[in-house]
Amino acid sequence: MKYMRTNSLKRLFTLKRRSFDEDEANPHSSIIDQDNDENFKNVPLSSTPQKPTWKCFSFGEIFDATNGFSSENLVGKGGYSEVYRGLSKDGEEIAVKRLTKTSSDERKEKDFLTEIGTIGHVHHPNVISLLGCCMSNGLYLIFPFSSRGSVASLLHDVNLPPMDWQIRYKIAVGTARGLNYLHKGCQRRIIHRDIKSSNVLLNTDFEPQISDFGLAKWLPSQWTHHSIAPIEGTFGHLAPEYFMHGVVDEKTDVFAFGVFLLEIISGRKPVDGSHQSLHSWAKPILRQGQIEKLVDPRLQGAYDLPQLNELAFAASLCIRSSSTWRPTMSEVLEVMLDGDMDKERWKMPEEEEQEEFWGFEELEYECGSSFSVSPRDSTSFMDTSLDSISTRSS
C-alpha cells in the first residue's frame, strides 16, 4: 500500500464520514443484514445508524487546551503516541492523543486512521467516545478526560488502597457490556484485539470505558474470522489461535476478557516476575474448585461470594484454549448477571478436556522472549495513576 500522507488521511476521513451520512439517509444499505445475522438477535439496535458526533478541532484549539503541549500536562506515553490533559474553551477536561513526530511510518498513521474510523461510530456508556480529531501539524485524537485513569493504574498502584470488591464487580460487568456491544450491538462487528486493564478507563463514578482502538478490526457479517500477520497485542492476553495461527474473531477478545476478569479478582498482573501468565497460574485453581484462593489477599475476605463464583466461572470459560468452547460475551453476561452456571451445559467432551492442558502455557513461555508485540504495549492510552494526575493538575 502506498505511503499515506496527512492530506490523504484528511481526504479519506472525509470520504468515510460522507459515506456514513449516506448510510443514514438509506438505512437499508447497511453493510450488515441485521434480519439474517444471528449475532444481532435480541440486541437492541436503533433503526438507523447514529450520526457521528465528533468534530474537527483546529490545531490552535488543542494547542491552547494543553498549554502548548506542556510537559506538565503529559499523562501518558507509549511507543508511538503521547497523551496530554487539556481544558477546552467550554471548560471541559479533554485528553489529546498525539502521534509522536518520530512515528512517521505508514503503519502508525494507519493505526490512527483505524482508531478514528472505528471509535467515531460507536455509542455506548462503556466505550470511550471520540470528541474529535485534528490533522493539522500532525495527527491528534481528542477524548473526554478520564479523571481516575485506567483500571491497571488503580489496581496495581502500591501507594493506593486496594480497590474494594463492589467497584471491581462494577468494572467487570461494565466492561463485559461494552465488549458485548462492540461484538453485537454495533452496525459492524468490532474486534478490539487489545482488551486489558490499561485499556479500560474509569470515570468519576468508576464506570469503565473500553479505549485504544488502534488494533481494532471490522469483521463483516459473512466472515467467520480474520487471518492476521504480524501478531500484535499484549503478552499474557493472547488467545492460542491468535498467538499460533493469527486467527482473530470475537472469541479472541473473550479470551483476553477472561484474563481481565482474573486480574480484577486476584489483583495480580497478567504476567508475573517469573514470566508466568496469570491464566496459566489460575487454571489449576479453577479446575480444583478452590475459587477463594484466586482472591486478592488485600481484600481480607471482604467480597461477595456469589459474585465471586459468577466471575470466576465466567473467567474459567473465557480462558479455554479451544475457542469453540468459549462463550460469547452475551453468554458471559448471562453467567455474571443471571448466575447461569450450568456446568453440564459447558462440559467439554473428554478428548477436548485432555487437549485443554496440552501445554499452550509452556509454548507461550518458550516464545515469550522472542515474541514481538506492538510497541504500543509499553504504555497504553492514559495508563497513568491517580497520583500522577492529581500532582500534575495541582
Q: Across the structure, where does each feature detected by a protein language model lie?
A:
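Glycine-rich ATP phosphate-binding loop
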Residues: 82-103
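Conserved catalytic-loop aspartate of Hanks-type protein kinases
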Residues: 253
